[in-house]
């Protein structure tokens, strides 16, 4: 039944969470040197690729030569090279290591979604930031031996002319073995079987996520999704579907009108196993006792410690409704990233999402920041020369530029960020604005956030 369990702090991949935090603080304390070393590693690996060969680096790996020789790039500059790779060019065009697949960006450029390279380095950096973020969350909200009710979904996959899989970056991550291992390590193993995550129909997968979560209600310690709107949508669906869910639990069989996919039905049948009228009655009783569904998450998942997902930028719009469903449970803003790669971790998870800040990971990419100065009477911004991670000024607005192991070289991320203060020697940012975060938007002119209602990025000495 739905009983509360005691929790205590846990470990991350066999290492104590405090050790993960200590290593993170070590690299942020030495951010300038770590940034130089990160650039050196990227150029040592990729300096011989076609894109960089003709720029006159001549083996140099220092920031000054790199900035002098390599121009700032937009996605349009890199797109012809990415298209060649997608079409089957196996030579080292942008990266020495081959792309394993193509990621479709969540943003848009001139009305179409962008192609980006995806390789094992991106998987590694994703697992790195997951572990760091979890270590800080677990210090604030400890969990152990639990599961996560994760509303995560794969996207449709296509094949490029060259035979590479093209899908969203999250789908590429979910399909990796490293993802499953990391979720186990950080006590975030999904309640739902893979057949649900990779199911052919979104509505069927959402319904099964809810059903699997109810069946594992006593074990759920984290409720999460990539984006806040996915959690809100899930519980809006729950409001309409709870009676069907109870009926499925009562008879031990998933409704044929709700789920038609044979593979998903087989996977859910293994979870249901047998009728459970006691659990069905308890869920129904708890639902009937709720007032306008306020606090439905802690009511049905009493061991849940927090709700987790991206809640800044355009996702802040959903925080009020999410807080209604969460009742008194903390809302924790997830990591900060762009289509080009990860930027920072939320190292103060107890801070409300509206004030969430993100500390840049200096060893995950080489970062530069273009200062943006408002133009009087114009409504736009004038750009200055980029500065390094340790050169930004508190209270100023910047656009993030990234050089990564995945072939994004001095690539603009179309993210506006505000420097608030330093965390040790790294920067703490507030995400001010992202252009076209939704995969459904079709124009770069559709800016999905405003300066009055967004998250931010901060920097300050602590």
Curated annotation (Swiss-Prot):
Jasmonate binds at residues 106, 334-337, 339. Induction: At low level by auxin. Induced by wounding. Pfam families: GH3, GH3_M. It catalyses: a jasmonate + an L-alpha-amino acid + ATP = a jasmonyl-L-amino acid + AMP + diphosphate + H(+). ATP binds at residues 103, 126, 172, 337-342. GO terms for biological process: response to auxin; response to light stimulus. One of its GO terms (cellular component) is cytoplasm. An L-alpha-amino acid binds at residues 170-174. InterPro entries: GH3 (IPR004993), GH3_M (IPR055377). It comes from the Eukaryota. Keywords: ATP-binding, Jasmonic acid signaling pathway, Ligase, Nucleotide-binding, Stress response. Signal peptide: none annotated. Expressed in green shoots and flowers. Its EC number is 6.3.2.52. GO terms for molecular function: acid-amino acid ligase activity; ATP binding; jasmonoyl-L-amino acid ligase activity. PANTHER family: GH3 DOMAIN-CONTAINING PROTEIN, JASMONOYL--L-AMINO ACID SYNTHETASE GH3.3. Belongs to the IAA-amido conjugating enzyme family. Catalyzes the synthesis of jasmonate-amino acid conjugates by adenylation. Catalyzes the conjugation of jasmonate (JA) to Ile when expressed in a heterologous system (E.coli). Catalyzes in vitro the conjugation of jasmonate (JA) to Ile, Phe, Leu, Met, Val and Trp. May catalyze the synthesis of indole-3-acetic acid (IAA)-amino acid conjugates, providing a mechanism for the plant to cope with the presence of excess auxin. This is Jasmonoyl--L-amino acid synthetase GH3.3. The gene is GH3.3.
């Amino acid at each position: 039944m739905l009983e509360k369990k005691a929790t205590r702090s846990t470990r991350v991949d066999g290492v104590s969470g405090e050790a993960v935090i200590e290593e993170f603080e070590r690299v942020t304390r030495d951010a300038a040197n770590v940034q130089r070393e990160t650039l050196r590693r990227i150029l040592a690996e990729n300096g011989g690729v076609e894109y960089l060969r003709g720029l006159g680096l001549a083996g140099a790996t220092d920031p000054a030569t790199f900035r002098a020789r390599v121009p700032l790039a937009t996605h349009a500059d890199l797109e012809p090279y990415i298209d060649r790779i997608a079409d089957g060019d196996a030579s080292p065009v942008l990266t020495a290591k081959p792309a394993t697949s193509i990621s479709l960006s969540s943003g848009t450029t001139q009305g179409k979604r962008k192609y980006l390279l995806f390789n094992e380095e991106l998987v590694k950096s994703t697992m790195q930031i997951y572990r760091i973020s979890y270590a800080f969350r677990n210090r604030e909200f400890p969990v152990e031996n639990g599961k996560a009710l994760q509303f995560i979904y794969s996207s449709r996959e296509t094949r490029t002319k060259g035979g590479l899989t093209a899908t969203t970056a999250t789908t590429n991550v979910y399909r990796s073995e490293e993802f499953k291992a990391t979720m186990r390590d950080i006590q975030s193993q999904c309640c739902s079987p893979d057949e649900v995550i990779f199911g052919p129909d979104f509505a069927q997968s959402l319904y099964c996520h809810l059903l699997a979560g109810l069946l594992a209600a006593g074990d759920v310690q984290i409720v999460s999704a990539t984006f806040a709107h996915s959690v809100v949508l899930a519980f809006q669906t729950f409001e309409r579907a709870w009676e069907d869910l109870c009926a499925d639990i009562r008879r031990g069989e998933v409704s044929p009108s709700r789920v038609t996919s044979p593979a998903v039905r087989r996977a859910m049948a293994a979870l249901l196993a047998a009728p459970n009228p006691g659990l069905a009655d308890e869920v129904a009783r708890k639902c009937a006792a709720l007032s306008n569904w306020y606090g439905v998450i802690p009511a049905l998942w009493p061991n849940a410690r927090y709700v987790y997902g991206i809640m800044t930028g355009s996702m802040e719009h959903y925080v009020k409704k999410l807080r209604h469903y969460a009742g008194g449970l903390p809302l924790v803003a997830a990591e900060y990233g762009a289509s080009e790669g990860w930027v920072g971790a939320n190292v103060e998870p107890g801070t409300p999402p509206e004030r969430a800040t993100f500390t840049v990971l200096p060893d995950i990419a080489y970062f530069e920041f273009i200062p943006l100065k408002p133009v009087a009477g114009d409504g736009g911004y004038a750009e200055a020369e980029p500065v390094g991670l340790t050169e930004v000024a508190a209270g100023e607005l910047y656009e993030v530029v990234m050089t990564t192991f995945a072939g994004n070289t001095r690539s603009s991320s179309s993210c506006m960020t505000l420097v608030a203060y330093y965390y040790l020697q790294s920067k703490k940012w507030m995400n001010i604005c992202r252009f076209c975060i939704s995969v459904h938007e079709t124009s770069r002119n559709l800016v999905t956030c405003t300066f009055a209602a967004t998250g931010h990025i901060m920097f300050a000495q602590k």
